Amino acid sequence: MAGDSRNAMNQDMEIGVTSQDHKKIPKQARDYIPIATDRTRLLTEGKKPRQRYMEKTGKCNVHHGNVQETYRYLSDLFTTLVDLKWRFNLLVFTMVYTITWLFFGFIWWLIAYVRGDLDHVGDQEWIPCVENLSGFVSAFLFSIETETTIGYGFRVITEKCPEGIILLLVQAILGSIVNAFMVGCMFVKISQPKKRAETLMFSNNAVISMRDEKLCLMFRVGDLRNSHIVEASIRAKLIKSRQTKEGEFIPLNQTDINVGFDTGDDRLFLVSPLIISHEINEKSPFWEMSRAQLEQEEFEVVVILEGMVEATGMTCQARSSYMDTEVLWGHRFTPVLTLEKGFYEVDYNTFHDTYETNTPSCCAKELAEMKRSGRLLQYLPSPPLLGGCAEAGNEAEAEKDEEGEPNGLSVSQATRGSM
């Protein structure tokens, strides 16, 4: 029994890295990282692909179907036009102007037809409503000149046509309204900060490892631009279906993940890449999740980064998500910041890179209970990246001493007392 317990403990605690990843580890820690063995487990093995709630690009995979009250979209026409794709937006832009020009061109032609101006083309003694208007094409061109205010040239309205003067006023007013509406739509669509979010980066994976003697869920964010995001803030949500005690099934239930709201750590000064940390404590949804349970769970962590664009003052939002298969247990992010002569340099080639580190396989709840009960919880000061939790019974320790094996990461209470 003791031998089986010891072997299981060693299997849980022995985590290594490949020689290829050895270069990505900080120089001061490379000597302390063990080489990967056959017992190294990958979290993504055995997982079936599932539908994402949110793509890595931030697009939500939610389609609204069977919408009966479609008139609601027309009640907010401005937002509807802004939300259209560019090809449809340009099509609407062109069609609106063309239709208004054709409509008023037809009215100008109708006035000329009713007055009989078309029958006196070239008659010097006849005073038409619009000089040199000889047909529908001329009326259409005159409508364009009137609405775009490019100035009259060959065709011009006369003062002997009161109905033409009234139509001129109406077209000028309606033309200004159309210009304000359509140009406003185009300006808002062009100035939308969606493209600003393209230069905000999230790490490809989230990691779970020890930080300050506590299990933490971490991911990294960065900004590629020199112009910073003002008042940047980060928040995260756990998307996971659950069933209540009454038997109600809640699909895609959203649970807040504390990333520093109570301490102010969620307010970011995003000049260089930052590692966002969520402490797994009693209030965390991952409180009872161990490494083995992580491989069986199905969830998605959605992260949202918000702030104001420094150049425009408009609010920008960047989103990403991490599936359960994208959460790496026992990993840390490779440092990307180095000190050069007179400045700090960020190496984005290693922005997504992680390296493995010894991390307890038990859940945070068990880790806290073991610490409170005085059972083994020993963090070695050297090497700095090694640490673990395990129970050490007197029987297991005696067997290790007989076999001449080092205690490793587990030390008996008597040994700890002597230290």
UniProtKB/Swiss-Prot annotation:
Biased composition regions of type Acidic residues, renumbered to the chain: 394-405
Record note on quaternary structure: Associates with KCNJ3/GIRK1 to form a G-protein-activated heteromultimer pore-forming unit. Associates with KCNJ6/GRIK2 to form a G-protein-activated heteromultimer pore-forming unit.
Descriptive protein name: G protein-activated inward rectifier potassium channel 4
Superkingdom in the source lineage: Eukaryota
Compositional bias of kind Polar residues: 409-419
Annotated region (Disordered), positions in chain: 388-419
Gene: Kcnj5
Catalytic activity reported: K(+)(in) = K(+)(out)
Residue numbers on the Cytoplasmic membrane side: 1-86, 186-419
Topological domain spans for side Extracellular: 112-135, 155-163
Keywords: Ion channel, Ion transport, Membrane, Phosphoprotein, Potassium, Potassium transport, Transmembrane, Transmembrane helix, Transport, Voltage-gated channel
Family in the record: Belongs to the inward rectifier-type potassium channel (TC 1.A.2.1) family. KCNJ5 subfamily.
Subcellular location: Membrane
Extent of motif Selectivity filter: 149-154
Modified residues (Phosphoserine): 5
Residues the UniProt record annotates as site (Role in the control of polyamine-mediated channel gating and in the blocking by intracellular magnesium): 179
InterPro entries for this protein: Ig_E-set (IPR014756), IRK_C (IPR041647), K_chnl_inward-rec_Kir (IPR016449), K_chnl_inward-rec_Kir3.4 (IPR003277), K_chnl_inward-rec_Kir_cyto (IPR013518), Kir_TM (IPR040445)
Membrane topology: Multi-pass membrane protein
GO molecular function, one term: inward rectifier potassium channel activity
Regulation: Heteromultimer composed of KCNJ3/GIRK1 and KCNJ5/GIRK4 is activated by phosphatidylinositol 4,5 biphosphate (PtdIns(4,5)P2).
GO cellular component: I(KACh) inward rectifier potassium channel complex; inward rectifier potassium channel complex
Keyword DNA repair: no
Tissue specificity of this protein: Expressed in the heart.
Intramembrane region ranges (chain numbering): 136-147, 148-154
Membrane spanning residue stretches: 87-111, 164-185
Record function comment: Inward rectifier potassium channels are characterized by a greater tendency to allow potassium to flow into the cell rather than out of it. Their voltage dependence is regulated by the concentration of extracellular potassium; as external potassium is raised, the voltage range of the channel opening shifts to more positive voltages. The inward rectification is mainly due to the blockage of outward current by internal magnesium. Can be blocked by external barium. This potassium channel is controlled by G proteins. Forms a functional channel in association with KCNJ3/GIRK1.
